[in-house]
Amino acid sequence: MIPDVSQALAWLEKHPQALKGIQRGLERETLRVNADGTLATTGHPEALGSALTHKWITTDFAEALLEFITPVDGDIEHMLTFMRDLHRYTARNMGDERMWPLSMPCYIAEGQDIELAQYGTSNTGRFKTLYREGLKNRYGALMQTISGVHYNFSLPMAFWQAKCGDISGADAKEKISAGYFRVIRNYYRFGWVIPYLFGASPAICSSFLQGKPTSLPFEKTECGMYYLPYATSLRLSDLGYTNKSQSNLGITFNDLYEYVAGLKQAIKTPSEEYAKIGIDKDGKRLQINSNVLQIENELYAPIRPKRVTRSGESPSDALLRGGIEYIEVRSLDINPFSPIGVDEQQVRFLDLFMVWCALADAPEMSSSELACTRVNWNRVILEGRKPGLTLGIGCETAQFPLPQVGKDLFRDLKRVAQTLDSINGGEAYQKVCDELVACFDNPDLTFSARILRSMIDTGIGGTGKAFAEAYRNLLREEPLEILREEDFVAEREASERRQQEMEAADTEPFAVWLEKHA
């Protein structure tokens, strides 16, 4: 089932320096909660400055949904320590609140109680909140409070030059973009390994269903927790953050221009379903527009091609201008065993897997095959640890045992690990391979199995509150290592100044401005 990567691995072993200079970054979302686990109703903590313009700490859907962002970094330890500093400072500046350590929320009874993220009075800030109003009216606020970790990854130019020859200008844009689309296609085919290993949402609180019927064969505990005994990541299931209306958009990952055309089409395609919501009600705007996507960011995807945007530039226009610059991996649940929601083992695994995806052959993928890859993902998401579970290749009928496929993949990853260790020194990547490959013979070692044992004992609420309390105490006591207190104060002041400048620079009323941007 795994493509034959032996030639590509032999090439890599002859060109180890091609992997020197991998760049990465992390984004981590987490809900602010009270000591009893209920959602905080306070505004964004003052010490964190402006959520609109702060470089490192912002908000996602809700005012209580924090998002931490590291700068691009070539050093894993430095990146994780930077992320930990963001958590340390925040833990000291959020009063008695703490950070919810799980992907799935628990103590939220009614979606309407969730305050949307607020970004001030600038047109840009009001637009961001209106986008979230549209998300709430389309999918419900509760679904939008699900948290995850995003891992951003780019290969060094040395890799592309070693692989594609001496490239520059338009040639580099085309070839590097084609290389990243290869990564994306392989990710769709084999990325289910991420929820298998690191999925940490095998259960939900009964309040999350809000009384809606479900076809999933949940087991229920006395405290009202619903779980699937072999599930890995209900966050990635249809219960979680998915958009069924997007499944027939036909967006593919074979070619830059084809992908961008599909994305641009989606933000222009009217939706009958969303038209029923309306645009305005009693003078209040309900969504940006009633198209399938309000804006490009609404496209649900487990992985995205990205380029840093310039001011006023859409993500797709940035891709057209310069091609793909990096990849955003979006399938990581919050790691409940880490105070910062992610750990070194995961980052090193993702490095290995991304390199493997760049090396392995990846035939073009039609939208129908893309849909077929979802079958494997769904199996792993809902019953990944089930004995005897098999997976297929694309739309073909042949089936292969998941543990065997996993071990075959790790045989390749071990060779990538040896190459990365040879240029970085030590055996850190090989150690990660040895630790994780054991999960295929013993699924009890996976994150989902480990957290489910705790949840069955104490419920999701009990588990979440215990971790949240422990991490709050730990982070509040730890000294900062990279950033200093004055760095945070300076960024708070600078972010507030940037927001004020944006608000002062606006000359058009929001309604007029919106007509140009909707």
From Swiss-Prot:
HAMAP family: Glu_cys_ligase
Catalytically driven reaction(s): L-cysteine + L-glutamate + ATP = gamma-L-glutamyl-L-cysteine + ADP + phosphate + H(+)
UniProt keywords, alphabetically: ATP-binding, Glutathione biosynthesis, Ligase, Nucleotide-binding
Pathway where this protein functions: Sulfur metabolism; glutathione biosynthesis; glutathione from L-cysteine and L-glutamate: step 1/2
Species name: Escherichia coli O157:H7
GO molecular function: ATP binding; glutamate-cysteine ligase activity; metal ion binding
GO biological process: glutathione biosynthetic process
NCBIfam families: glu_cys_ligase (TIGR01434)
EC number of this enzyme: 6.3.2.2
Entries under InterPro entries matching the protein: Gln_synth/guanido_kin_cat_dom, Glu_cys_ligase, Glut_cys_ligase
Top-rank EC class of the record's enzyme: ligase
Name of this protein: Glutamate--cysteine ligase
Keyword Transferase: no
